[in-house]
Amino acid sequence: MTNQYSILFKQEQAHDDAIWSVAWETNKKENIETVVTGSLDDLVKVWKWRDERLELQWSLEGHQLGVVSVDISHTLPIAASSSLDAHIRLWDLENGKQMKSIDAGPVDAWTLAFSPDSQHLATGTHMGKVNIFGVESGKKEYSLDTRGKFILSIAYSPDGKYLASGAIDGIINIFDIATGKLLHTLEGHAMPIRSLTFSPDSQLLVTASDDGYIKIYDVQHANLAGTLSGHASWVLNVAFCPDDTHFVSSSSDKSVKVWDVGTRTCIHTFFDHQDQVWGVKYNGNGSKIVSVGDDQEIHVYDCPI
């Protein structure tokens, strides 16, 4: 427990190339903290966070090209990764073995995300569709069509009701998962949407864009609730804190920023990376933040809670 933000741990040379994606899952029952990273070196790495440091548990081979997105199931010991090789792979975190390889072609699967119940895996495509795969079956079950451009980012709402997608032209779409209907189209950004994240109560959607801005939307009414500036360049990733009151962002300006949702202000900036910071996540209780970037490093920060 701490009352200030500080860098706690640095894993240098964590991969042999840029690290573009990170996930952190806390297994509360067994008190296990798992971090998964995906890199342009074609590898997925599984780390355990214990005694205030990361320990490499598995280095997972299988992708033929760079890994651009990783996620960890909220209910099962499974990780998923998507790659420029147009395949999604599912990995067993208990033995480090590949469980499934899903052909997500014809071109590529960009961002992927597990549904809150971990029954499904959603991935954005270059054709403006979100493909939904069954985790058990490994098959495509249905698609949500934005009728738009290349989808760079997707997110499920924690209550399982909504799926949001962000496209290369700055358009954000929110779908009702139960009906598959498009609920809202938001046009708040004029440049690519690199990342989006719902608040834990599923009421707010935070978006990150190459225009340097972060926007906060009220999901139900599709109202813009705030525009935040502070990054000097592209905002590459955003992630909400489990406490509902903060979120974190990372940027090509090499910084990681923590924001207060209520006041819409930046309350802390970390300048520890040497290059663009592609991925950022909180752990299960919001006491830590992990970040990854082009400098091939993984950083873990302490947060006051």
Swiss-Prot record:
GO CC, one annotated term: euchromatin
Modified-residue entries (N-acetylmethionine), positions: M1
UniProt-listed SUPFAM superfamilies: WD40 repeat-like
Keywords: Acetylation, Cytoplasm, Nucleus, Repeat, Transcription, Transcription regulation, WD repeat, Wnt signaling pathway
SMART domains per the UniProt record, alphabetical: WD40 (SM00320)
Subcellular location: Nucleus; Cytoplasm
UniProt modified residues of type N-acetylthreonine: T2
UniProt record, GO biological process: negative regulation of myeloid cell differentiation; nuclear-transcribed mRNA catabolic process, 3'-5' exonucleolytic nonsense-mediated decay; rescue of stalled ribosome; transcription elongation by RNA polymerase II; Wnt signaling pathway
WD repeat spans: 14-57, 62-101, 104-143, 146-187, 188-227, 230-269, 272-305
Domain of life: Eukaryota
Chief place of localization: nucleus
Role summary: Component of the PAF1 complex (PAF1C) which has multiple functions during transcription by RNA polymerase II and is implicated in regulation of development and maintenance of embryonic stem cell pluripotency. PAF1C associates with RNA polymerase II through interaction with POLR2A CTD non-phosphorylated and 'Ser-2'- and 'Ser-5'-phosphorylated forms and is involved in transcriptional elongation, acting both independently and synergistically with TCEA1 and in cooperation with the DSIF complex and HTATSF1. PAF1C is required for transcription of Hox and Wnt target genes.
Subunit and interaction comment: Component of the PAF1 complex, which consists of CDC73, PAF1, LEO1, CTR9, RTF1 and SKIC8. The PAF1 complex interacts with PHF5A. Within the PAF1 complex interacts directly with PHF5A. Component of the SKI complex which consists of SKIC2, SKIC3 and SKIC8.
Family: Belongs to the SKI8 family.
Record-given protein name: Superkiller complex protein 8
Source species: Rattus norvegicus (Rat)
Taxonomic placement: Eukaryota, Metazoa, Chordata, Craniata, Vertebrata
